[in-house]
């Protein structure tokens, strides 16, 4: 089972322009094996909000994609963060600090035994 990061989910937005390796991997991996994190959902939401402010027409397209495609596709498979996740995340910063959101996503994957 896999935890998808923002870049993989974003790649699915335009199926006709999706990288062929991503397409092949997604086609051979059943959707029931794909999870994501609340941190990824926050990053996607932040991107949509930014686009809605910058370019309302494109923002509306992204909003529809997020609400009508992504959220339903991951219904029941958006993993939360909790105190256990926080402990795992903190350990990922020692001895060297790591990017915050990436650390939360990695900690979530580790907590749930996902790749």
Where are the predicted features?
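Active-site neighborhoods of divalent-metal-dependent phosphate/nucleic-acid chemistry enzymes
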Residues: 46-49, 60, 71-115
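Short, well-structured N-terminal submotif of metal-dependent ribonuclease cores
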Residues: 1-40, 50-67
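Alpha-helix N-cap/helix-start and coil->helix boundary motif
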Residues: 9, 41-45, 86
